[in-house]
């Protein structure tokens, strides 16, 4: 009997796939017996472009360790071959699954889309776009009804900073975004279009667009008509699913859902549990990730760099130079310090607001309905100077929110209502850039005031760290202006940076004046950062820099505590102002900070998000009853 072919430590078995440039083999590790997929690539078939794509795939996969991304073990190079050793998925791909099952139940579609969203979240955090998302590239861990889904085949993927736009024509025609077909510049939202096409196919059994040939297919994708669901499925599909499909398959990428909105869409949400004040995990110290020590979700458990994994050549993605570099603390040290404090006295930054709630906020609190929380949140936005994001004649009805109530007899404010409303804010602002710009202005204004307070009290390093976040906020606003101008076809505006900033928000009915105003605000923040940097240099403050997000979080807690004290002393106006500041900063952390281009990147664990939503809900509840 002929012995198995050996590649490194792996014995190759049967062929399980093939393509234009590669053959895929099922293989086993000779020592551990681990089954893997080995992609064999003939170097002679590689053009320089294809070789570059291959190196990108190695580079991307070597930096990611996530259950919804295909796992990369190593690359082995011989004289005429390159072998990629990858995780083996016995369930085949999603295309085969759809061929076997046809349209799937909505629960199964929801399962797969949640898995896809989790994988895309990792790519988005790393500023990668896949560019070829399709059922054939979504692998399944087993042949179960609801297996684990993993994103694979990164040959077309590329690193993309939030400001940059790709121009390469690539991807599968059935799942290709209109902006790619039109040969326009595109960004990571092209992946969201593909995700929408995949969801549509899951729940209907067929892609959203077809044609007799590529020309007809492309015409059907780019023409401005409403997405149509097959007659036999219209009454079967939940409105949330229909909304997600339509929101992802918007031809104008500006109107398409953002990644944040996609991850938080109602269709993908898990059933929520209402925290119990006395028995919630928030009120105990478990030693798990807490906000000050929360690490970016992709910063730990990574595989070795490609320089270590590729035997003869390495490849690694260069860090983006477009990010705002943030001074930061040692997360590991902070985590240990925090854990050491928790077990004894429940003190420290993380638990301080919890103690505030017990002392000031949660005393004899009356029951609050979701509708009440909705009104409270809307009122807070108006009081803060926000635009009327939920107009009175379009306010979400109590009946539509009724489905969000897990329990009708639970007293106290509900975090679910705040999360729902914040998501509605995000969903509406994508269609209205002026509203989003004003929201960013509110965050920038609050952070600028915080930086000023700290600078006035001699906390120059903290002030500098927060000012860098302000710069990141205005940079995002500039990106929105650029995209807005592109969508309406306005010419580029190059405002004079020496022009004095506007003292108030201008009329934002068109992108040109909006960009002028945003640029002026950015320059103002940049000048402030330079002044603070000069102060630091003059004082030789080359010491450890504080973490900006911890600083913002701590100050939000302090505002909440002070507001509770003022409420206790019946100083209602002062209490309302302090509560409002705390709510705004906490809302910034949970809704906007995680989307900014910061270095190091900032992320929250699910527990952190729930905790902060709970704080926001309680603070809103107290403020509404002053």
From Swiss-Prot:
ATP binds at residues 16-24, 39. The active site is at residue 132. The keyword RNA-binding does not apply. One of its GO terms (biological process) is protein transport. Changing residue 360 to A: Loss of binding to ATG8E. GO terms for molecular function: ATP binding; protein serine/threonine kinase activity. Its main location: cytoplasm. GO terms for cellular component: autophagosome; cytoplasmic vesicle. A motif (AIM (Atg8-family-interacting motif)) lies at residues 360-363. Residues 315-325 have a biased composition (Low complexity). SMART domains: S_TKc (SM00220). Residues 288-347 are annotated as: Disordered. Residues 288-308 have a biased composition (Polar residues). Keywords: ATP-binding, Autophagy, Cytoplasmic vesicle, Kinase, Nucleotide-binding, Phosphoprotein, Protein transport, Serine/threonine-protein kinase, Transferase, Transport. Residues 10-268 form the Protein kinase domain. Phosphorylated during nutrient starvation. Dephosphorylated in nutrient-rich conditions. It is found in: Cytoplasmic vesicle, Autophagosome. Disruption phenotype: No visible phenotype under normal growth conditions. It comes from the Eukaryota. Its EC number is 2.7.11.-. Residues 330-339 have a biased composition (Basic and acidic residues). Serine/threonine protein kinase involved in autophagy in a nutritional condition-dependent manner. The ATG1-ATG13 protein kinase complex regulates downstream events required for autophagosome enclosure and/or vacuolar delivery. Becomes a target of autophagy under nutrient starvation. Connects autophagy to plant nutritional status. Belongs to the protein kinase superfamily. Ser/Thr protein kinase family. Interacts with ATG13A. Interacts with ATG8E. Binds to ATG8E on autophagic vesicles. This is Serine/threonine-protein kinase ATG1a. It comes from Arabidopsis thaliana. The gene is ATG1A.
């Amino acid at each position: 009997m002929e012995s198995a072919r050996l590649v490194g430590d792996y014995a190759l078995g049967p062929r399980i796939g093939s393509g234009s440039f590669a053959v895929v083999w099922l293989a086993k590790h000779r020592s551990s017996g681990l089954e893997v997929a080995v992609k064999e690539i003939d170097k002679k078939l590689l053009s320089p472009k294809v070789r570059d794509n291959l190196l990108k795939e190695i580079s991307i996969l070597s930096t990611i360790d996530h259950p919804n991304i295909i796992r990369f073990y190593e690359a082995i190079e011989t004289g005429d071959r390159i072998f990629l050793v990858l995780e083996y998925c016995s369930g085949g791909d999603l295309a085969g699954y759809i061929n076997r099952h046809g349209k799937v139940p909505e629960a199964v579609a929801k399962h797969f889309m949640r898995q896809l969203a989790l994988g895309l979240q990792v790519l988005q955090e790393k500023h990668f776009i896949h560019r070829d998302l399709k059922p054939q590239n979504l692998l399944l861990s087993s042949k179960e009804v609801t297996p684990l889904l993993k994103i694979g085949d990164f040959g077309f993927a590329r690193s993309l900073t939030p400001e940059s736009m790709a121009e390469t024509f690539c991807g599968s025609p059935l799942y290709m975004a209109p902006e790619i077909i039109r040969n326009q510049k595109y960004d990571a939202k092209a992946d969201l279009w593909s995700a929408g096409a995949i969801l549509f196919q899951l729940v209907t059994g067929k892609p959203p667009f077809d044609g007799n040939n590529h020309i007809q297919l492309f015409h059907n994708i780019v023409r401005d008509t409403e997405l149509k669901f097959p007659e036999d499925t219209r009454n079967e599909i939940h409105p949330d699913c229909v909304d997600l499909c339509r929101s992802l398959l918007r031809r104008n990428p500006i109107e398409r859902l953002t990644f944040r909105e996609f991850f938080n869409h109602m269709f993908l949400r898990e059933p929520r549990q209402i925290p119990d004040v006395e028995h919630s995990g928030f009120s105990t110290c478990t030693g798990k990730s807490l906000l000050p020590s929360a690490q970016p979700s992709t910063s730990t458990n990574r595989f070795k760099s490609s320089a270590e994994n590729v035997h003869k050549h390495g490849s690694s993605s260069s860090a983006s130079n477009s990010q705002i570099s943030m001074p930061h603390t040692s997360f590991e040290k902070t985590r240990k310090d925090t854990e050491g404090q928790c077990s004894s006295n429940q003190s420290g930054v993380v638990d301080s607001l919890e103690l505030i709630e017990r002392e000031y906020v949660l005393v004899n609190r009356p029951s609050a309905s979701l509708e009440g929380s909705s009104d409270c949140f809307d009122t807070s936005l108006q009081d803060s100077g926000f635009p009327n994001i939920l107009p009175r004649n379009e306010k979400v009805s109590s009946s539509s929110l009724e489905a969000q109530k897990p329990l009708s007899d639970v007293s106290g404010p509900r975090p679910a209502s705040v999360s729902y409303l914040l998501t509605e804010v995000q969903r509406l602002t994508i269609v209205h850039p002026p509203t989003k710009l004003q929201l960013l202005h509110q965050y920038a204004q609050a952070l600028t005031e915080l930086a000023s307070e700290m600078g006035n009290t001699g906390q120059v390093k903290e002030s500098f760290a927060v000012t860098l976040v302000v710069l990141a906020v205005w940079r995002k606003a500039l990106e929105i202006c650029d995209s807005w101008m592109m969508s309406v076809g306005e010419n580029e505006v190059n405002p004079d940076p020496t022009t004095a900033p506007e003292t108030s928000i201008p009329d934002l009915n068109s992108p040109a004046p909006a960009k002028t105003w945003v640029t002026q605000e950015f320059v103002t923040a940049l000048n402030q950062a330079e002044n603070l940097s000069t102060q630091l240099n003059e004082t030789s403050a080359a010491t450890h820099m504080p973490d900006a997000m911890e600083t913002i979080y701590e100050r939000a807690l302090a505002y909440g505590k002070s507001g509770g004290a003022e409420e206790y002393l019946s100083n209602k106006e002062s209490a309302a102002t302090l509560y409002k500041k705390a709510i705004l900063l906490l809302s910034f952390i949970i809704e906007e900070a995680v989307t900014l281009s910061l270095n190091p990147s900032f992320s929250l664990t699910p527990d952190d998000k729930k905790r902060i939503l709970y704080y926001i809900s309680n603070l809103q509840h107290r403020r509404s009853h002053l």
